[in-house]
């Protein structure tokens, strides 16, 4: 059975969408919370086209007792079958829609909702949620509702998301994004953290005063 790419994939927020939430949260003094959903795929519901007549059967996993002539009926989507990511996204989206949330533009994993004049911004990267709202009580209520529907943990204020470190100064109205830890990890993995940087020689014949001429289409001699 051929499975389309849309059935296998899970929509995730683009980097620009994530930065947009923070750019809105900063001047509006929004608090940003981080929620992690536990075993997200098994908390999704099967899609109508999954398996045979809506039921998915599997053979016993390696090392497990195998009775001749028997197969197992899955009760929840598992990682490894074609559509668990899409099933989770569909289930999670249905819940958010039931709470009045609407998609933001072309982003399928970003939502917003206004409750009692308080706007909540939501981003979901599979099992990682970032929730932003200027009112702490409203943010807590929404987060608690999410965790009542899906098993997960409250990780506190968001400090890392989509590979970026997030440093916020609420008083100064400033947010700093950094990937320093990622660059450091790569250098340490390849034993290059303590390497001496190579000295790049500057070409004495190439001077900055030629660039205005290049931009204007004038000839320059090297």
Regions found by a protein language model. Name each.
Residues 1-222:
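Long, low-complexity, charge-biased intrinsically disordered regions
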